[in-house]
Amino acid sequence: YEDIQYDSRFLEGAILVYLKKLGVVAPNKPDRTEMGSNREKFTGAYVQDPQRGKHDWVYDLDITSMYPSIIMSLNISPETKLGKVVGWNAEEFISKKNKTYSIIMNGKKQGQLTETELQDYFDKNHVSISSNGILYRTDKKGLIPTLLSSWFDKRKEFRKLAKKFGDEGDEEQYGYFNRRQHIQKIVLNSMYGVLGLPVFRFYDLDNAEATTKTGQSLIKFTRKLGNHFYNKELGTDKDYCIYIDTDSVFYSAVPLVKKRYPNVELSDVMMTQRINEIATEVQGFLNNSYNYFAK
């Protein structure tokens, strides 16, 4: 009953098997009284209200496996968590607001650091920071990022095989590996959720919120990048992002098509080609800009 009622059991079991291979004993599960008193909520995904009206030739771009990628990039795991930066705001830090910050380590508040000193601290001590201010060591790969990396590679392998058999016309094998890659996707995306589940053995609200809040920051940054791409070409200062949902941004290709092909009536076939070209351009621009966000 519990294996079905609590889908976290599968993920917990995978972690326990991995720890056993390493010869590491996992911590005990929290007892039921702890579970009952620890049902705090954590920040979820960011959803932007859609721009009202009818929008033509809309395309969407999504961040591949956003939550698993965040966990792997920041090295979010129970044993890699170091402390917290008080009053952390990623956008303010990027904008150089000349704030000072203090760090809490082992329950003790340390002295004030300038932005430059804090950046030096991150670099010299191999530390990453999430959007809720939690610090993680990055000199040693964490348990959960290691598992996710393995599952991520397995999904890529299944997708590659699905494409291979699809191109060969083998529908049975294509269907099998396509289902397998989809299952891997579900498993990958489930991990962040159970981090904030009190019945999960490795429950940690900070780690759960580190994932979702960083996701919020990342998708908002994506919107800014997309708008910058549009505004730079069009010579405007507008918000062209029609809608945001978790890991996806939606734009219309119409403004750019009208700028590039003035006074030209394009057929649906030609418009489809143009929208694919524009989506590919914007996607490339976004991908090349994410390193700035990571730094």
Please name every model-derived segment.
Residues F250-K295:
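C-terminal polymerase-core module
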Residues T100-N125:
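Acidic, low-complexity intrinsically disordered tails
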Residues E40, S65, T100, F158, ...:
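Conserved core architecture of multi-subunit DNA-directed RNA polymerases
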Residues F152, G215-R223, A279-Y290:
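Short, hydrophobic/amphipathic alpha-helical packing segments
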Residues K84-K108:
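Compact, glycine/acidic-enriched structural inserts
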Residues I219-T246:
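Active-site palm subdomain of RNA-directed nucleic acid polymerases
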Residues Y1-P78, K84, E91, D170-K224, ...:
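Common nucleic-acid-contacting/processivity interface regions adjacent to the catalytic cores
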Residues Q119-F200:
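Active-site cores of enzymes that catalyze phosphoryl transfer or operate on phosphate-rich substrates
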